[in-house]
Structures are given as structure tokens and as C-alpha cells.
Amino acid sequence: MTLVVSSLSALDLKLSKKMNDEKFVKLSGSGIIAELKKARIQVVAALPDIVTSDGLLWPISKNSDFRLIRVCKEDEGVSICAALSYTGTRALLLMQQTGLLDSLNSIRAIAMEYQQPVCMMIGLQGKNPAEKIADAENYSVRIVKPILQLMGLKTVIIENEKDISKIAASISYAYEFEQPVCFLLGSPPKADGDEYD
């Protein structure tokens, strides 16, 4: 048992050193929310997840500019976002990559084959902010981008503050050309008042 504990401690130290040695950026939750407002998103369908809850989901739930729809499964959110587009309402589905992987059939049918402007923002649970998505140790993180590319789904990587400025234009493109878009968040968005090194 001691061997396992010491191995875990060594792994924790290795990850801690890697994160301290490499410069990485925490994303601004308020910056992302400002882009969603700029894109005229009115509804956010979401399940709570560990990656986006503090910096996005909770602030969105308290913001009167958005209506939050809590869904039980991510594929419900795909249908809701697609249906809202018929009313002229712009929506965003907020989830983590495990929910995305679980919803691929709905995304394939509703978003891709029926060409619906389903906009999805994906928190990558288990991704070290210092690593690239393609190099992630977590298997479910590593396979997300290639799967989305294989499907032909427009994918936007959000790794830093400069990338955040791509959100509004990508959402507008999705609604103008009736195509889905998926944003992959390279690190957990920080809530206002959070301090990072």
C-alpha cells in the first residue's frame, strides 16, 4: 500500500512541476460570457460539470441576460438548441467531453445531417492546462478533436484570451450558415475574483 501512495505522490509532484515549469493561461469566464452576449446567445442548456461550473455555469445562472435550461442528458440539449433556432432564439449547449462523446448520435443526426446551428462549448475534464489537446494524457480528451474533425464539425480551440475573441463570430457563422460549431476549452474558465499565478 505504501508503494501506491508514494507513486501517487510522485505523480502529483511531476504534474505540479510540469504546470509550474510551463506557462499556461486560465481563461476568463467573464470574457467568454461577454462574447456569448455579443453573439446574442439568450439560452444556455447545461449539465453541471467540474470544468465550467465555477467560471461559466454559475455566473450564467445568475445573469438575467441568459435563461438557463438544466438538462438531464447532453443529447437533450442538442435537441433543445436546434429547436430554439426555429424561434429565432440563439442557444449554447455547455457540457464536458464525456457528455459530448455520449451525444455523438444526436449531434450527427440533428446538427450535422439536418444542418442545425447547434453551438456547443466543451470543458475538457482531465486535461492539464499546460498540455496540448492532441498530447493530453487523458484518452477522452485526446480523441475529441479528431472525432469532431472526422464528422466535419467546425471546431474552435479556446486556449487563451486571444482565442476568446473568436467565439461571437463563430456563433454568428453557425446561425448564418445553419451549421453546428464546437468550442473546446483548453483550461477551466476562472470566475471573477479568482486569482491564478
Regions found by a protein language model. Name each.
Residues 11-197:
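Thiamine diphosphate
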